[in-house]
Amino acid sequence: MPQKTVADGTRAGALAKAPAEAPARRWWILAVIAVAQLMVVLDATIVNIALPSAQADLGFSDGNRQWIVTAYALAFASLLLLGGRIADLFGRKPAFLVGIVGFAAASALGGAANGFTMLVVARALQGAFGALLAPAALSLLNTTFTDARERARAFSVYGAIAGAGGAVGLLLGGVLTDAFDWRWTLYVNVVIAVVAFVGGWVLLGSHRDAADAKLDVPGTILVASGLFAVVYGFSNAETHGWGSPLTWGFLIAGGLLLAAFAWWQTRAAHPLLPVRILLDRDRGASFLAVLLTGAGMFGVFLFLTYYLQLNLGFSPTKTGVAFLPMVGALMVAAQLGTTVLVPRLGPKAVIPLGFAIATAGMAWLTGIGLGSSYTSAVLPQVIVIGVGLGLVMPPAMQLATGGVAAEDAGVASATVNAMQQVGGSIGTALLNTLAASAATDYLAGHTPPSRQVQAQATIESYTTAFWWSAVLFGAGTVIAFLLYRRGVPKQDADAAPVVHM
C-alpha cells in the first residue's frame, strides 16, 4: 500500500505512543524537562555578560574571546542531529540523564578553569552534552503528551520557557558576576542540573525506538568536521588575515566536507538529516531565515555587551537589564507575528518585513559614539531590532516544521535549531574578524595612537560589526521575499510544533 505524503515528500505518520502517564505526572515531567532545557538555553548568553571579567582574569586576547561563545555553539550545532539519533538508539531517559550529568560536569570544569584552553574545552563539552540533552527532551515531550491538545499546551509552555532563556541568561549572568564571580555563571548549572536529574530519575519512563535507528557515523564525521573547519577558517582570518593560505585552506576544506555530507545524506540508509525534511520550499526558506538571523543576532549580543560595559561603564547586572527592552519587544512581536499576522497575511508578507525592521534597527545602532547615552543611542534601537527579530524568528521556526509528520518532528526541530547555532558560530567569528580589521585600519590611519584614538578605534570595531549585521538582515529580507510562497500556510494536523532549543 503506498505511503501517504505531505509537504513535498515528508512522510505522514504518528509518533509511537509511549505508555500513558497519569495527568498530574505528565505536567511534572514537563516541569523537569523545562528546567533542563532552560539550563541549555541560558548558557548561550549567560557567559556573554561575564566575558570581560573572564578575559581580565584569565588574560586571553581579544582575538580569542569569540571562542568562548563559538566553542559552545559549534559543538551544540554540529552534534545536535547525532544526539537525536543516540536518544532513539539507546533510550530517551538515559540520553536525558547522561546529558544532564555531562553538562553539569563540563560547567564545573569551566568554573574551575585556570586558563583559556581549559575554559574553551569546557564550553565545547557543554555544547556536546547539550546536543545530547536537547533532542532527548524534545522526544520525551512528544512521547509523554500523546493527546494533540495536551501536546500543544505542553509545547507552548516549553517553548515559552526556552524562549525566555536568553533573557534569563543575560540577567542571571550579570547578577552572578556582580554578586560573586564570573565563574558562578558556570557553577550555577550544577545546581540546576541536580534538580533536573533527580526529577528525571524519579519521573521519566524508559522508552526507546531502536528498531530501525542506526548511527550515521560517516555523516556525523563529515558535518562535524566541516562545520569546525568553516568556523575555524573565519576565526583564523582575524589573526592571520584573509590572505593567509591557512584561512582559505580551512574554508575550502569545510565547504567540501559539507558538500560531501549533503551528498552522503542522499545515499545513507539512515541519514543524520533525511532529505525529505528539506524538500518543502517554505521550510527551506525558514532554515535560511533562522541561519541569517542567528548570524546577525549573536553579533548584537556580543558587541553590544562590550560597548555597554567597557564604554558606557555598565555593571554586568545593569548590562543584563539593558537587554530586557529588546527581549520584551521581541516577545510581543513574536506573539503578534505567530498568532495574528502570519495566519492572516502569510510568511511572504511578515518575515521579510521583520528582516527589514531589524535591518533598520541595526543601521540605526551604528550611530553610537564615545559620548553617547543608553537612552538615546541604544534603547530605541534595540527595541526596533527586537520587534524585527520577533517577526522573523518565531514564525520561521514554526514554519520550519509546518507539514512535517509527527515522526519527523524531532529531526526537523533539531535541524532548525542547528541552523540557528551554526549561524551564530559563523556570525560571531566573521563579525569578530571584520571588527578587528576595522580597529586595526583606524589605528593605522591615526597616529600617534593616543588614548582617545584607541577608544575611537574600539567604537569603529563595534559599528563595523553592527553594519555587517544589518547587511545579513538585509540579505534575509531579499531571500525571504523571493523564497516564501504567497498565501497562508497550512499546518498538518499530525505535525508537532517546533520549539526553540
Describe each region flagged by the PLM.
Residues R26-I49, D62, I68, P218, ...:
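12-transmembrane solute porter fold
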Residues L138, V190-D209, A224-N236, A253-A268, ...:
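C-terminal membrane-cytosol helix-exit motif in multi-pass small-molecule transporters
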Residues V98, E150-A162, D212-L222, T247, ...:
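Cytoplasmic-side transmembrane-helix entry/capping segments in multi-pass membrane proteins
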Residues F116, D181-R183, S206-A213, A237-G243, ...:
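Membrane-interface helix caps and helix-loop-helix hairpins in membrane proteins
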Residues A87, R92-P94, E150-A152, D209-L215, ...:
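Interfacial helix-loop-helix linkers and transmembrane-helix boundary segments
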Residues L171-F180, I426-Q452:
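Transmembrane alpha-helix termini and helix-breaking/packing motifs in multi-pass membrane transporters
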Residues P2-V202, L336, L345, A363-T366, ...:
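Transmembrane-helix bundle of Major Facilitator Superfamily
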Residues M1-R25, D209, R451-A455, L483-M501:
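Intrinsic disorder in cytosolic terminal tails and internal cytosolic loops
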